[in-house]
Amino acid sequence: MRGRVSPLMLLLGILVLASVSATHAKSSPYQKKTENPCAQRCLQSCQQEPDDLKQKACESRCTKLEYDPRCVYDPRGHTGTTNQRSPPGERTRGRQPGDYDDDRRQPRREEGGRWGPAGPREREREEDWRQPREDWRRPSHQQPRKIRPEGREGEQEWGTPGSHVREETSRNNPFYFPSRRFSTRYGNQNGRIRVLQRFDQRSRQFQNLQNHRIVQIEAKPNTLVLPKHADADNILVIQQGQATVTVANGNNRKSFNLDEGHALRIPSGFISYILNRHDNQNLRVAKISMPVNTPGQFEDFFPASSRDQSSYLQGFSRNTLEAAFNAEFNEIRRVLLEENAGGEQEERGQRRWSTRSSENNEGVIVKVSKEHVEELTKHAKSVSKKGSEEEGDITNPINLREGEPDLSNNFGKLFEVKPDKKNPQLQDLDMMLTCVEIKEGALMLPHFNSKAMVIVVVNKGTGNLELVAVRKEQQQRGRREEEEDEDEEEEGSNREVRRYTARLKEGDVFIMPAAHPVAINASSELHLLGFGINAENNHRIFLAGDKDNVIDQIEKQAKDLAFPGSGEQVEKLIKNQKESHFVSARPQSQSQSPSSPEKESPEKEDQEEENQGGKGPLLSILKAFN
């Protein structure tokens, strides 16, 4: 009996196995319904595993992917491409040499350990950088594409793979901020106040500009920007129109009539209000704000309520207001807090700025009458008549076009106000103000600032920007990965010269980092306004032209070693340009060669041969402007 298996025992064993199998099938994650098609396909792929343990592990990992709708992760760790379709606009690729074993395309893991979408900060950066990604999807073995400068069809291509020059257009240019990157903080039918996105949100290389914000104010004729103060130091510049700006603290009040090219500093905490006193012309003001509380963030505080902003007086309790004004709360509410003040307001209406009726009380920019304009401008001083103004007062206005221009010829002008004892308004901020005017069809020669980082606002006209940067080669990488590694230096890593281009128009902003060469071409008369940061002891250095040419200062023997041509040829080439700083954008005729006829052919051959590799980084930088 011991050696025999009872039929009853055998039947019981079969029933037990069937029960276990049914239980396993019911508990399988594959039977679980999921609304995530990616996770569902993952569960289906797990059924291909022949081993039960591996299949269960696969299904367990698939359930975690249910929280990420963009998942393309294969939990079985297959190195080949999956059957899953990529989201629209994305391209799939197989594993490339150098890829990590833990596939980088898998969803990000949040702090809590669950799989989920990116956080708010990452989503904001991703939205900011939502541009075509074809460049960084290039396989690692492929060389950078040849460069054809934007808008120059028909010209000879330049920047071949051997020259290590790569071009980034406006869409991929982190130094360029088109006007659409402004967001409106206050706006109505009388005007608007817009703030540009934070520079450090665009790229980590702008960390030094974290505490600098650009603001644009636009107001229609005979309008007033209501009084307010802010937790930020401000420097405003009149771009267009005529304004009367009043600045007040607890003991003093000053009003100035400002015209185009005039600047004024408004210290943090000072009450200010801006009047467009012109009858027909709109007012445009550019302002740079430097917050004093939270880096990169500032707030406006209005004593009077409007549709866009409540009065900060409403934040105090009733007892505090009664004690502060030594009056009953009903009177305080009627005079300061309520818009409709009744008959008493009607009696004093002639002495008030405006009746503030519902018709014009639509925001922080209000319409004013001619009588109010005359009253507000009665005691204002002109910039040219400083008279009794105290010397060294940081609230004194600045005329950017006062005196002779720093640089000038028939093709353009440059005015600059530096941070020195003559300009205490800028000295403690270590800032400079620059005004550039480039004639139509002219070029501001390639140059760079030795120390200052300049934020440039396009005030008028159109043009083209070329900015040269030297970066670590970043092929086959996404924009976010490249940004995260911008501040990491690797010894022995390859460097490449990149040309960043942009088409400039009114309202755009671009950044000129220190030591980065820049050239600006004006397709129509172009006016630029620059706010320079870290401006003390800054020098503007040109790479071409008759004067202030740093390449001309390089010794002849060093030129022999650095450039394809000889030192004599380089010096002769430099002397071809008779103008300085601003020149015609049309290249001169190539009919006359700088070399003698006997040596023309061999010199060209030698130069073409050297152009393939170059002799140094200086040559690569110069090539980027071709």
UniProtKB/Swiss-Prot annotation:
Known glycosylation sites: 521
Composition bias, Basic and acidic residues: 88-113, 120-138, 472-481
Cupin type-1 domain mapped to chain residues: 175-333, 398-571
Entries under SMART domains matching the protein: Cupin_1
Stretches the record annotates as Disordered: 70-183, 377-405, 472-496, 577-626
SUPFAM superfamilies: RmlC-like cupins
Organism name: Arachis hypogaea (Peanut)
Induction and repression of expression: Repressed by water stress.
Pfam family, one: Cupin_1
Feature: compositional bias, Low complexity: 587-596
Keyword set includes Glycoprotein: yes
Compositional bias of kind Acidic residues: 482-491
Protein family per UniProt: Belongs to the 7S seed storage protein family.
CDD domains found in the cross-reference section: cupin_7S_vicilin-like_C, cupin_7S_vicilin-like_N
Signal peptide: 1-25
Keywords: Allergen, Glycoprotein, Signal
Designated name of the protein: Allergen Ara h 1, clone P41B
Domain of life: Eukaryota
GO molecular function: IgE binding
